[in-house]
Amino acid sequence: MITRLSHLFLRTLRDDPADAEVPSHKLLVRAGYVRRIAPGVYSWLPLGLRVLREVERVVREEMNGIGAQEISLPALLPREPYEASNRWTEYGEGLFRLKDRKGGDYLLGPTHEELFALTVKGEYNSYKDFPVTLYQVQTKYRDEERPRAGILRGREFVMKDSYSFDLTDEGLTESYRAHRDAYERIFARLGVKYVIVSATSGAMGGSASEEFLAESEIGEDTYVRCLESGYAANVEAVKTLAPEPIPFDGLPAAKVYDTPDTPTIATLVAWANEADLGRTVTAADTLKNLLVKVRQPGGKWELLAIGVPGDREVDDKRLGASLEPAEFELLTEADFEANPFLVKGYVGPKALQANGVRYLVDPRIVDGTSWITGADEKGRHVVGLVAGRDFVPDGTIEAAEVRGGDPSPDGAGELVAARGIEIGHVFQLGRKYTDVFSVDVLGENGKPVRPTMGSYGVGVSRLVAVIAEQHHDDKGLRWPAEVSPADVHVVIANKDDTAREGAEGLAADLDKAGLEVILDDRKASPGVKFKDSELLGVPLVVVVGRGWGEGKVEVRDRFTGESREVAAESALSEIVKTVRG
């Protein structure tokens, strides 16, 4: 097919959009691929839609290749299935909820575990029907608090979600592995650099969980890996390597000191090093206690205290993952006033446990470790408070930040931190949803068998932005051939009728050879056409200009920047050979 730019619904922009922060957002808007409608909501224009459809094609081919079957479920869903699974409340404010004219509750689907489980229950009733894997490529909806980066994090997005149903755990493991392998093929074909990391399951539930993260400095997900062992995990899933307990026999008794004006870790450390405690004190010697309130779905707010070494910040994502499915909030001034035993800046374990506040600590706070922490009175701290002797926490929690240089959980070396964008996620859900909906089928022995599920997602529209993020330069986009909106971009760079006729003929021959061609036949200057060819990002640009009269055309590689002249009579075969490798 030949796409003429003189007819194409396209308007390129020379300036970056004011709200764009990341390269992919800037370039996709400037190149006329997408347009913003509202925060987190975008229209796909012709060339952008082509790229999106190419990504969908690759995903479908690989899903079909593992025997998955495509169906399509509605995006508008009734409340009842999600209430049965508790996700009506677990999803919190991220769920788009609405009512029909009769007052019935509905939602716009974020994922479809419930509906797929019910669909299989309604259609299959025998072990002979299994295993089965179903998938869809569909628009999803999530009410993101801060949609950003264009189509990277939107409120409306295209996703491939698939669900496997097996009768045994071994079967689930096989389905999981098949999807994992398929995802590796998908991302390889799309030219995406990625890592696979261990992850948490969150509101999805289930056990085994891995994320596919595209390597990117602008990614919202932080992951760590150990170069010595290959261990890799999203920071939310990292398990802290706890030290061995220390015998506390013979340790000096804890002592309370007056520490005026020391409500922060920095001021406390400064005081300690001026107080002649017999050693140099760092923030790592202090115990910081964070107060939050938590609420289980449908429950009431309760106080929770979290103790971490003073040199560590609490990571909200890690804390949220550890508390899942409960939600949490920091305490307000009103909360402190209602609980006068909580003295801001001076909270210690003693008052927490005396008043029945659940107290969870970082795994590094093991028996025998000695700490400087609040004494529950303004302007006073306790020095030498020993875990296991002077206070006994209610348990541990993974909430402290993970840093590069921390020991790897497998003990093989140090962790290296990097950032990435989630492009895929695979879960072994188990029987969470088949239990909720009593999905039973007749087993081979005549007894009921409950299938076990896997859930597997790929961010299809997000992948368009990820590819743009990883494949661009200061001139514009550089699409991998697998997803490019065309195979060849032919530029008529001369107003001469002979050059125009030559370009038209070459484009027609390329079309007959089965290539997708963009032909820039606009009445615009060569400079404008060249800039647009670089911005649009088709991997091969063919310039038909002054050289045509001498029997030559110029072939430019958008990725390498290299250009070469080829004879006009051999241009067709050279271009086809280049495109098809």
Swiss-Prot record:
Superkingdom, natural source: Bacteria
Record field: catalytic activity: tRNA(Pro) + L-proline + ATP = L-prolyl-tRNA(Pro) + AMP + diphosphate
Q: Does the keyword Ligase apply?
A: yes
The record's subcellular location field reads: Cytoplasm
Q: InterPro entries from the entry?
A: aa-tRNA-synt_IIb (IPR002314), aa-tRNA-synth_II (IPR006195), aa-tRNA-synth_II/BPL/LPL (IPR045864), Anticodon-bd (IPR004154), Anticodon-bd_dom_sf (IPR036621), Pro-tRNA-ligase_IIa (IPR002316), Pro-tRNA-synth_IIa_bac-type (IPR004500), Pro-tRNA-Synthase_IIa_type1 (IPR023717)
Q: Which GO terms describe its biological process?
A: prolyl-tRNA aminoacylation
List the GO terms this entry assigns under cellular component, sorted alphabetically: cytosol
EC numbers: 6.1.1.15
Single GO molecular function: ATP binding
Keyword list (alphabetical) reads: Aminoacyl-tRNA synthetase, ATP-binding, Cytoplasm, Ligase, Nucleotide-binding, Protein biosynthesis
Assembly state and interactors? Homodimer.
UniProt lists the family membership as follows: Belongs to the class-II aminoacyl-tRNA synthetase family. ProS type 1 subfamily.
What does the comment on domains in this protein's record state? Consists of three domains: the N-terminal catalytic domain, the editing domain and the C-terminal anticodon-binding domain.
Q: What does this protein do?
A: Catalyzes the attachment of proline to tRNA(Pro) in a two-step reaction: proline is first activated by ATP to form Pro-AMP and then transferred to the acceptor end of tRNA(Pro). As ProRS can inadvertently accommodate and process non-cognate amino acids such as alanine and cysteine, to avoid such errors it has two additional distinct editing activities against alanine. One activity is designated as 'pretransfer' editing and involves the tRNA(Pro)-independent hydrolysis of activated Ala-AMP.
Q: Which HAMAP family does the annotation name? A: Pro_tRNA_synth_type1 (MF_01569)
Q: What is this protein called?
A: Proline--tRNA ligase
List the gene name.
Answer: proS
